Amino acid sequence: LGNGAYSSLHETRARYYQDNRFADVFADVTRAPRALLAEIAEIEGVLDAEARIVKLGLLDLEGMKDPGSVLFVSLPGGAGLNRLYLREGRLPDPLSAEEIVIADGFAKAHGLGPGDRLAVLMNGKRRELLITGVALSPEFIYALGPGQMMPDPRRFGVVWAPRAGLEAAYDLDGACSNLVLKLAP
């Protein structure tokens, strides 16, 4: 019975990662031209490559004694790697600089959902963003903020936003700060 349960859990996890196109390689960079992606995609063994913007922002929520932060991750234009599973709402309009999707655990910890606004500091500027959806991601099953040993969804959350808005907020027009790759088996 124990081996059967383990095998079932192992297969379920593998299928979840496969269905949601979980990346094999994650690389942070300070700033790289997005045009570099074409060269990376040509490397032998790379099945798919995606250039993203991944940046920290600070939470500006009433009632929080200790500072909190969010990790902004740009949404891919197409099917993309590390697909989101929407629990509520919808994905942001790709042309919007104000719409976001937030991680499920973070949403529950703060009682937030579609239609609510989230106040954050992005690159030193305060912004109020409209939550359009709540999602799960294979990349952030356990979301750990800077210096955290254990997940604390009250103090750290993941926020997905359209690329254009993050490019403007973090002065990364035509650039990326993170690369993810799917490799051939």
Locations of regions flagged by a protein language model:
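Membrane transport/envelope proteins' first extracytoplasmic loop
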Residues: 1-185
